[in-house]
Amino acid sequence: MARRTEQRRAAVWALYQSDLLGRPLGDTLPRDVHMFTLALAEQAREHQPELDELIRRHAKDWPLERIAPLERSILRVALLEMLHPDVVPGDQPIPPEGAIDEAIETAKRFCGSGAPAFINGILGAVLQERTGAGP
């Protein structure tokens, strides 16, 4: 079984490919996709209008369309886990700070050098807005 980090990254890649290629989400997932990955990707797509509105609001001076597609996908998955832990399968949802850490690590590995700080800033602002706490 793949680790949760790998499953999150698989969901991010599926969303990224779907956005970039304009293909249905189901076409970007392997047949033997893990239930956790499938739920993350599908729920991020289902909640996308809400998640994108949060990204728009907190990405000051950055229209959503200017944010790199991979960074948008990372943000969507992290925001989903932060705001809707009930829609993701599993006994123990990741705490919001953990979702932020996972997103930052994914950005460090796969995005440009400025992406981790950008992602941290947006996710931290959402956390602050929702709970009064920051990372």
Label every model-predicted segment.
Residues 1-135:
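N-terminal interaction/assembly modules
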